[in-house]
């Protein structure tokens, strides 16, 4: 009998699903929401190895953990929140946002928590996936420790930042003090008065150090190579801004669009080396460092990279240099020789610590690790990727049928929010999944996998473009690329370009098999669409139109108060300059950078 994919998976069909999604983080939730709102498919399961939704935001609990992208853009386009506490959300607030979204869209009934996928194997005869699942929960394991789940389509939503990377340093297992990885934080440990060694100076380290420095007796940061760092300029969002964002929806739209325009403009800064904007940002980074460390000129050269900005992840922080300026915080750039029983030994020094923090990132280029995946003919994903991970637009893999990835190879960004990429991928994959499910409902079969020659041509084009970007700078080694220099993680262009290229599924790019393949092949292409967030008008038009609407609502609500509003001296496509009287302040002209935030600040000044 034909299968009904509109029914939820219940007790009687616990081991069968039309779709299985691995991971309940940003990607997995987005995929599930698209299935709910873009297809009639309800027979799907989300397997989450943790005990909550949120993915990396549920796992990274370290002090100071926060997003590097503004909240208006680092959130789903279809779930814009008007009451973020600050421009850059912290881990706890973003996790709350994720749980709220999961609750609103009814995702919890589809999620199986504490479920670790060990292996996924394609059955050529049955044309289905067989997924081996192990249960982490002690209570669940009383019923069964593991089981096998069959599905017609498998989606990996495990992302790139899910498996911690532990450094290969001799003696790490000999250390007798407290050892914590930044992605596996232990809040039961008391950090007050402790001597702490922090290995690493990347995105997590610069957020951890300022927090630990508040109570630690001494901190030493072990730096392998310097990073480009810019100020975060984080601002709390006040009640009046919340009011405006809540009751003037076009203002939320304007703010997100302007952030999108600014972030896309950053592509020329962070990805294209040698441009005037890139050199200006490098100069700004050095100016910021020197202004924050005026009494430590001996650190200026040590903290200045010799590679193009953007080659490694650009760091943003308002308080890292302030922490580094403290008398009880040191920077050590000598290579670590080994970890001793009591601390860290370099070539000419040994320091004892109560705690060593491993801020050493993730195994980002080892996609799906440690899950064992076997595609058509039993061919392993490890074998398919022996020359490096590659996937068609980061989503589909040769010889791996009815399989899709979210945030897969070459879809990470150095300049914008990855959620914008994930939403485009989720739309694309939901179209493919719908085709497979429709065939199944008609008691037919449909097997989809990318043509090897299409994938090869695509990958060559991507790598050729990447070779011209800052990511390829030989002077730096980053998690964007393998030890051999192959860039496996990053997309070489803008978000808008990616969205346009995946706005339709071109069926000729795929090998279609099964009794339902002919009907799909006849379609040539299926339009997916995209979220259009690049403004079709100038910043000036956006400013004036939304300001008029916001001003009207705001004035009606607060006209009985006395306000001193600064005079706007200049408004243009390149930014704003404003200031007058007691509340005067002037911003640098920056192309669309914080135009919406600037407007909100004008409208949010306190009473005179």
Curated annotation (Swiss-Prot):
Q: How does it sit in the membrane?
A: Multi-pass membrane protein
- Return any one Pfam family short name: FMO-like
Compartments where found: Membrane
Instruction: Specify where it is mainly localized.
Output: membrane
Question: Which top-level group of life is the source organism from?
Answer: Eukaryota
> Which cysteines bridge via disulfide bonds?
none
| Keyword terms of this UniProt record | FAD, Flavoprotein, Glycoprotein, Membrane, NADP, Oxidoreductase, Transmembrane, Transmembrane helix
Enzyme Commission numbers on file: 1.14.13.-
* Cofactor info, note text: Binds 1 FAD per subunit.
Keyword Membrane annotated: yes
The cross-references to SUPFAM superfamilies, in alphabetical order and at most eight, read: FAD/NAD(P)-binding domain
Q: State what protein this is by name.
A: FAD-binding monooxygenase ktnD
